[in-house]
Amino acid sequence: MPTTIRDVAEAAGVSITTVSHVLSGRGRIAEGTRRRVEQAVADLAYRPNVHAQQLVTRKSRTVAIQVAGFADHVSSSALIPRSDYFLDLLNGAAEAAAERGYAVILTPPSADAATVEEFAVDGVIVVDPRGDEPLFSDRWHHPRRMVTTGRPTMVEQVAAVVDNDHRAAAVAMLEHLAEQGYRRPALMITTTARSYTSDVLEAYAAWTAARGMPPVVVTVDEPPTENAAAEALRSLLDRDPRPDAVYASAEDLALGVLHEAQRRGLRVPEELGVCSAVDSSVLQLTSPQVTGMFLHPRDIGRAAAGALLDVLDDAAAPPRDVHVPVELFARGSTLRRG
């Protein structure tokens, strides 16, 4: 017969209620008693009844993750955008949640409060939000139950924001271009409704202003595509003087710039440098390989899940920001000087 909670209580010399409190993390339990219960659980290989725990703690031990969608309906219907970044982030979040006994469900970008409530989740992680997504509605949204990766630009407060320092990352990339001899870098971005693109734009504007350089910015509609990037590059190349480098806010934009430049016979990196604010494995499949900023998305996912579960365990935990370091991978698309 399987081990029961009564067996654990008898082995530890405590009541069933005490065992329940130790397993659920509730109540004030003396450290010695806690250790005896934990030892009995280990010795007897006891596995708590998940459904019973949920009834006692009033928690489903399930969290939802929603990757914020794009403005167009087709792209917004996809659960996960075609990107290493999002896959790695989701894997990191799922790993961290599982380590603490939580399951993760993935909701479509269009899921509203009523849809999420049907799953009785304890909390939600929203990836790259604008802040106008259905989950931010007053009917459901509660700061204690939501963590975002990237600042929601239209919402004042959530339990935690996990992000990179995109301003510092942008400066690092622009300094790299300058070190390689580029003097007229242009910025290609999507909508600034998301915090990371607005941060990159602000950093670029400040960096060019400090050097007396005119900012050259071209904006493409979401979702970022290679075709949109190719069209945007054509407009940049019509300028006089034309840019000698393009800093793209997404990997698909960088790929589109590279392919259009090569189609036009421009030598990369000699005549045009190409780099991306988001690194991806696809940037290493081109010739030359494309310089990218690695954002450590798996660490972002782990940190987001950890921050959400910390809040669920301690309702008094204050809101916090978590910054995950970045790493610049300089590759052939910008290396003029080795």
Where are these regions (language model features)?
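N-terminal helix-turn-helix DNA-binding module of bacterial transcription factors
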Residues: 1-62, 335-338
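Amphipathic helical "hinge" segments at domain boundaries
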Residues: 46-115, 123
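Hinge/beta->alpha junction and helix N-cap segments in small-molecule ligand-binding domains
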Residues: 80-85, 108-112, 162-172, 188-232, ...
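Flexible loop/hinge segments that line or gate small-molecule binding clefts
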Residues: 127-169, 252, 278-290
